[in-house]
C-alpha cells in the first residue's frame, strides 16, 4: 500500500528491485504513476478546485481498485499476482487533470505542492530510520535497499517540485509561464528516465554489457 502511494509521488523503483519498501510478490508489477516534475500536485490542485468533475470521481474509483487486491485483479482476469500495468489509464487521466490545472490560472498549486512535499519528506524520514543488519548491529541510512539510488530519486523529485513552485509563482503574477513549464517538464522527463535506466543497468547482473 505504501509503495503504491510512494510510486505516485516520487520516481518509481526500478523493475524487480523494490527499494524503500520490499514487496516480493509484486517485483514485476509495474507499480508507478509519477508525473515528472508535477508529481501529484496538479491532480490534487485540480481535484480541490473541481470536486464534482468526472475525472475526479474516476480517479477515486481507480484508487480504490488499486488498493483492494481483488478489484485490482479484475483488470487482468483475476490473476493471483499483483499487476499494475492498467495504471496507464488513470495516469493519462491525471496528466489531463494536471494540464487543465496548469492552463487554468484560477487553480492554485500551493496545496498540491505542500502535500507532495510532505509525502517526500515522510519518505526521506523513513529512509534514515535505523535498520538491524544480519549481524544484529544497528545501521543508519540503510533502510532503503539501494540508499544511493533513493537519494538521487528524492533529489530529482524535490527539484521538480521546486521548479513547479517557481512556475506557479509566474502563473500567480500573471506572467508568461508556458515556455518555462515546457522546458522544465522536458528536463524533468529526461532526468527521471535517465535515473531509472542508469540504475537499472548498474544494478543488473552484467552492467558492463550495457
Feature map (PLM): residue ranges:
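Periplasmic/ER-lumenal interhelical loops and adjacent helix-loop junctions
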Residues: 1-52, 72-76, 83, 130-149
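Contiguous transmembrane helix-bundle modules in multi-pass membrane proteins
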Residues: 55-77, 81-210
